[in-house]
């Protein structure tokens, strides 16, 4: 190439998936990778700027949803009325209408209100928005970051990369969801893309969980069970045909249990049931 590769070069030349760099716990961003391994790379961000780039790299740059990426794009041009501008742009460019649940979820993502209490500390600096009358503007801390042209350049490249990934991999959603059939999602992705108000740790989901507010009911199945798991979680979930699955409820349930009734009467109750299947727990991408 004759120069330090840009993020787009990884997709253009297909040498490696740069998301593996983002997912690496000792790196977390392409910026951090360059600082660590590229002698000619001289840009140095502040600790807060570095954390913001890591957050966007790890949580948003895969392109699984366009909303946060286009929101960040708006913040490079405007300081106020961000949500209103975002809704208008999504409607015009993507024919995508943002309902109240989705708007609340996006705002929570961009104000560090979506994570569980323990996870909030990790990205405590990553509050991009602040409330302004009936809309949101750029937070003071994020506004300060945007005064650094080097930070802005890294941010814009990252956002453009995410938007490109969205268009290639995630723009053909299933029905009226934010999900694409046969793509891989983490538990956190599922909670976010189903527009839950808060994230849930996998332990609390425990195979499935009904969210009353959004009336969504994701079911998570490990198809191959490990030999060392307890008998109470050694469920005999299996496909009997390509469109027929036998899935077992959580232990201690009866036909009258609320979660069982929600599943059996999902259509009548207006509940959306989503099925996520992974081969086994060794699939780190779908963790």
Where are these regions (language model features)?
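Acidic, glycine-rich low-complexity segments with interspersed aromatic residues
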Residues: 35, 47-56, 61, 65-66, ...
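Charge-dense, extended regions
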Residues: 103-213
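Terminal accessory regions of large proteins
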Residues: 51-55, 59-146
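Long, largely alpha-helical accessory region at the distal end of helicase-like NTP-driven motors
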Residues: 2-86
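C-terminal, active-site-flanking charged/polar segments
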Residues: 1, 287
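Generic alpha-helical secondary structure signal
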Residues: 17, 34-35, 41, 45, ...
């Amino acid at each position: 190439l004759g120069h330090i590769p840009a993020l787009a070069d990884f997709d253009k030349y297909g040498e490696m998936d740069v998301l593996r760099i983002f997912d690496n716990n000792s790196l977390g961003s392409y910026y951090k990778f360059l600082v660590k391994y590229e002698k000619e790379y001289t840009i140095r961000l502040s600790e807060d700027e570095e954390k913001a780039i890591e957050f966007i790299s790890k949580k948003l740059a895969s392109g699984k949803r366009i909303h946060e990426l286009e929101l960040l794009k708006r913040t490079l041009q405007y300081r106020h009325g961000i949500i209103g501008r975002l809704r208008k742009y999504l409607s015009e460019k993507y024919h995508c209408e943002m309902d109240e649940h989705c708007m609340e979820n996006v705002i929570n993502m961009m104000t560090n209100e979506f994570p569980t209490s323990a996870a909030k500390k990790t990205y405590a600096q990553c509050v991009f928005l602040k409330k302004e009358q009936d809309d949101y503007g750029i937070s003071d801390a994020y506004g300060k970051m945007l005064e650094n042209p080097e930070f802005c350049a890294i941010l814009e490249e990252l956002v453009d990369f995410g938007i490109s990934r969205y268009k290639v991999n995630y723009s053909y959603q299933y029905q009226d969801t934010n999900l694409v059939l046969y793509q891989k999602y983490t538990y956190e992705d599922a909670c976010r893309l189903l527009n839950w108000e808060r994230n849930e740790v996998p332990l609390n989901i425990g195979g499935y969980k009904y969210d009353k507010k959004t009336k969504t009911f994701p079911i998570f199945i490990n198809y191959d069970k490990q030999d060392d798991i307890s008998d109470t979680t050694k469920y005999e979930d299996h496909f009997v045909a390509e469109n027929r699955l036998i899935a077992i409820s959580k232990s201690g349930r009866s036909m009258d249990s609320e979660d069982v009734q929600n599943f059996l009467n999902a259509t009548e109750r207006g509940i959306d049931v989503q099925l996520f299947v992974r081969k086994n727990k060794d699939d780190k991408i779908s963790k």
